[in-house]
């Protein structure tokens, strides 16, 4: 079945109706975006688990009626596999953990659906979130100590602990930082806060590095998702929930600049993932923070360090007393 109407030809769209595939591209001064959409007919080699109910085992009916019922209740899975890529520069003022970046939006999905034939578009009801790969790249020289914290959350969920899809901490001193999150769940296209389902929060700790208006880094992300007419259409690969890419290495030659020493022993950190954050680029409002602690609490760690120092001082004092007493 050809999913795309023949008259739909846009300048930003490359269409191959024979292969049921479309590519959307857009680039301007704000950034670059690219989207791929391919129909299920081109991916028949992917195995799917079908949910079936044998009506003949529930109702006693004549054979002719049975055949009519089977035909009447047969259903074809319509699946569009989509890959969306976007790149944008981030102002240092917007990199303080006070705003969120929606990685998938209703506007984007509606744009994809508008390219389909009406009979296919009207039955699409679900979006299945497969994977999100995020790459941060510094817009300054290598070697500057610039820790950064990232959290991907489902901001529809009220509990700040349960909303977390993945979190990571890195350092842009090496030029870039990348990780992948696998949400692996489906949601209705009619859900009220669809734009908040994949919310990216980023906290650039070296806030005095530049002034407001200066672009501190580039965020490039790829979202793999599928649009379907059923919640039972998709199986996910058995990946881990989050994967951290091994990109903590020097990139290029710094020359005449001192390269900082980065401490990798910090396992306890927190990031503010409070609800009702402003959209990236919008005016921010004062709000009550809600930090998610990763690892043990910092206060507990400080207490343990203090106890260790006290114990060490007691041992030193004990040795001095032994020397004075001639023991």
Curated annotation (Swiss-Prot):
One of its GO terms (cellular component) is host cell plasmodesma. Residues 297-327 form a coiled coil. Keywords: Coiled coil, Host cell junction, Host-virus interaction, Transport, Viral movement protein. InterPro entries: Caulimoviridae_Movement (IPR051596), Viral_movement (IPR028919). It holds the Pfam family MP. It is found in: Host cell junction, Host plasmodesma. The keyword Transmembrane helix does not apply. One of its GO terms (biological process) is transport of virus in host, cell to cell. Homotrimer, through the coiled-coil domain. Interacts with VAP. May interact (via N-terminus) with host prenylated Rab acceptor protein 1D (PRA1D). Belongs to the caulimoviridae movement protein family. Transports viral genome to neighboring plant cells directly through plasmosdesmata, without any budding. The movement protein allows efficient cell to cell propagation, by bypassing the host cell wall barrier. Acts by forming tubules structures that increase the size exclusion limit (SEL) of plasmodesmata, thereby allowing viral ribonucleocapsids to spread directly to neighboring cells. This is Movement protein. It comes from Cauliflower mosaic virus (strain CM-1841) (CaMV).
């Amino acid at each position: 079945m050809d999913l795309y109407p023949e008259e739909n030809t846009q300048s930003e769209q490359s269409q191959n109706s024979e292969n049921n595939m479309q590519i959307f591209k857009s680039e301007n001064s704000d950034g670059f975006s690219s989207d791929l959409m391919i129909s299920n007919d081109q991916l028949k080699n992917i195995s799917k688990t079908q949910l079936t109910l044998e009506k003949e085992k529930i109702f006693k009916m004549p054979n002719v009626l049975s055949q009519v019922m089977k035909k009447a209740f047969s259903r074809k899975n319509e699946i569009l596999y989509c890959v969306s890529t976007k790149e944008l520069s981030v102002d240092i003022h917007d990199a303080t953990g006070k705003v969120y970046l929606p990685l998938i939006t209703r506007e984007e999905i509606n744009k994809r659906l508008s390219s389909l034939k009406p009979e296919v578009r009207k039955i699409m009801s679900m979006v299945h979130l497969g994977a999100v790969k995020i790459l941060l790249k510094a817009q300054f020289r290598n070697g500057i100590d610039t820790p950064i914290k990232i959290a991907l959350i489902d901001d529809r969920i009220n509990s700040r602990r349960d909303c977390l899809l993945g979190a990571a901490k890195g350092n842009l001193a090496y030029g870039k930082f990348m990780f992948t999150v696998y949400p692996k769940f489906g949601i209705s296209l009619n859900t009220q806060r669809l734009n908040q389902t994949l919310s990216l929060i980023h906290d650039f700790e070296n806030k005095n590095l530049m002034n407001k208006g200066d672009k501190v880094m580039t965020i490039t992300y790829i979202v793999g998702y599928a649009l379907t007419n059923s919640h039972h259409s998709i199986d996910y690969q058995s990946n881990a929930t989050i994967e951290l890419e091994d990109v903590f290495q020097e990139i290029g030659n710094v020359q005449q600049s001192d390269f900082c020493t980065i401490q990798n022993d910090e396992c306890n950190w927190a990031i503010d993932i409070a609800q009702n954050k402003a959209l990236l680029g919008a005016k921010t409002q004062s709000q009550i923070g809600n930090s998610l602690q990763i690892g043990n609490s910092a206060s507990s760690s400080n207490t343990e360090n203090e106890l260790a120092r006290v114990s060490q001082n007691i041992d030193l004092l004990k040795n001095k007393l032994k020397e004075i007493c001639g023991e």
